[in-house]
Every structure is written in structure tokens, then in C-alpha cells.
């Protein structure tokens, strides 16, 4: 679960204390912070250092834009519980999902390639009904297991997913890893509605893309987003 999600912030919102310079972080960036829950508004999006778990280790976020940003994160070796979810975030005014004709995004991301002990995944995190229903779409998984149990399999625009359900959470776990690609969020929501898992009256609250990080084997590791777009078309 990803808690303590930031609301839509004014342009002068959180700028926590800047982190010291690390070799892995670009020398000249527009914004950088090591503050938990630090956030930066850019282009109608929020780049968010979401260290939501109280036991999270240190994490420095940097950004040139909502399309190009990253984190250097150090999380305890052997940990399997998610500690942080640094992400790019878009807030919505709770339109009915049924009123959205198209909702999809494109991404280009990278995680530590050969890091031993890495436990993390890249994923969309979609919140419905004022944060009461959570739908995730995992695209690049290294060691994580969704909560709950498999309730079915979905083929969405040629991509095959195992669909998991636990509590009020749903996860579409891609059957292979992709570091660049596109996720069809609206089609995933329609699958859940058509199978009776979420109500047809569900509303869209928030869309995020980032990494759920549980462990970096107690080493500072780099996660980078080098391309991102989100397209929403209402009926």
C-alpha cells in the first residue's frame, strides 16, 4: 500500500533540504531533495519523493522535469516490504471512469541492472473513489509479489497480465519485464468493471508512475525515468 499521497500542491509547495552531492546524481538539475515527502510541481504533474513507510532508508530525488527525474535510494538488505514509492503524480477531480474515453501513458525507466539483493518494481499506481480503491500495473518487476491472490488473467492490447486482488488493492502484473512501453490504464479499469471487481460508478482520483522499492541490499542504487507522458481523453 502506498500511503500519505500528496494532494495537489501550489507552485510554492514542499522544497525540503537539498541533499549532498552524489556522483550518481547529475551535477546540474532543476530540483533536488532528500526530504521524505518532498514534492516539486512541473507541467501539471508532481514529482514526489514518497518515502511513505516509517522504516524507509535514505532517498534523494532529483528532477529536470516530470519526464526526466530519478532517485538514489538505500533500503535495507533482505527487506521485502515496500519502503518507498518515488513517483510522478497527476491528480484528477474524480470524474467517473465511465466518462473517460482514453487513459494511457508511456514510460522509459531504468533500475540497477545487476544489483544483487534488489527488491523493487516499476509500476503505475491508480487511485479511485478518493483513495478507497487502488489499481496497480506492474511493468518491470525484480523480486516483488503482489498482495492477495491471482483472480484471473487479462490480455490488454496484446500484453498478458496476471491479475491479483488483496483487500481493496488490485494488481495487473505483466508476464515479462519492460523498461520502455505503454500502459493502457483505462482498458485495465474496464476489465475490472466488466468482471465485477470494481463498481461501474468508480471515479478517478490520481495516477502515478514510479518504483516501489523494498530493498537495495543496503547500497545506494539509482532509479531513473528518462521519458514519460500521460494522455487523458474524456468522452
Where are these regions (language model features)?
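Secretory targeting and sorting signals
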Residues: 1-23
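N-terminal segment immediately downstream of the Sec signal-peptide cleavage site
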Residues: 24-72, 234-235
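Short, hydrophobic/proline-enriched secondary-structure or compact coil segments at domain edges
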Residues: 69-73, 103-110, 124, 205-214
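Extracellular-facing segments of soluble proteins and assemblies that are Gly/Ser/Thr-biased and enriched
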Residues: 76-155
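Active-site-proximal beta-strand/loop segments in catalytic clefts of secreted hydrolases
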Residues: 138-142, 166, 212
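Conserved, mostly hydrophobic/aromatic
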Residues: 158
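Short, surface-exposed, low-complexity cationic segments
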Residues: 164-187
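Long, compositionally biased interface segments
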Residues: 179-235
Amino acid at each position: 500500500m502506498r500511503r500519505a499521497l500528496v494532494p495537489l500542491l501550489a507552485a510554492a509547495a514542499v522544497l525540503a533540504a537539498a541533499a549532498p552531492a552524489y556522483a550518481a546524481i547529475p551535477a546540474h538539475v532543476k530540483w533536488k531533495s532528500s526530504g521524505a515527502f518532498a514534492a516539486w510541481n512541473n507541467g501539471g504533474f508532481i514529482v514526489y519523493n514518497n518515502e511513505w513507510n516509517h522504516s524507509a532508508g535514505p532517498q534523494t530525488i532529483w528532477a529536470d522535469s516530470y519526464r526526466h527525474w530519478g532517485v538514489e535510494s538505500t533500503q535495507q538488505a533482505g527487506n521485502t516490504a515496500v519502503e518507498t514509492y518515488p513517483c510522478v503524480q497527476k491528480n484528477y477531480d474524480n470524474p467517473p471512469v465511465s466518462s473517460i474515453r482514453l487513459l494511457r501513458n508511456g514510460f522509459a525507466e531504468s533500475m540497477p541492472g545487476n544489483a544483487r539483493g534488489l527488491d523493487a518494481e516499476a509500476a503505475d499506481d491508480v487511485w479511485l473513489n478518493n483513495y478507497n480503491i487502488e489499481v496497480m500495473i506492474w511493468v518491470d518487476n525484480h523480486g516483488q509479489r503482489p498482495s492477495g491472490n491471482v483472480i484471473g488473467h487479462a490480455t490488454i492490447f496484446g500484453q498478458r497480465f496476471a491479475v491479483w486482488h488483496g483487500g481493496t488493492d488490485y494488481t495487473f502484473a505483466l508476464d515479462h519485464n519492460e523498461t520502455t512501453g505503454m500502459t493502457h490504464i483505462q482498458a485495465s479499469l474496464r476489465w475490472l468493471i466488466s468482471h465485477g471487481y470494481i463498481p461501474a460508478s468508480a471515479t478517478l482520483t490520481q495516477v502515478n508512475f514510479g518504483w516501489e522499492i523494498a530493498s537495495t541490499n543496503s547500497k545506494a542504487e539509482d532509479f531513473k525515468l528518462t521519458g514519460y507522458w500521460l494522455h487523458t481523453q474524456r468522452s
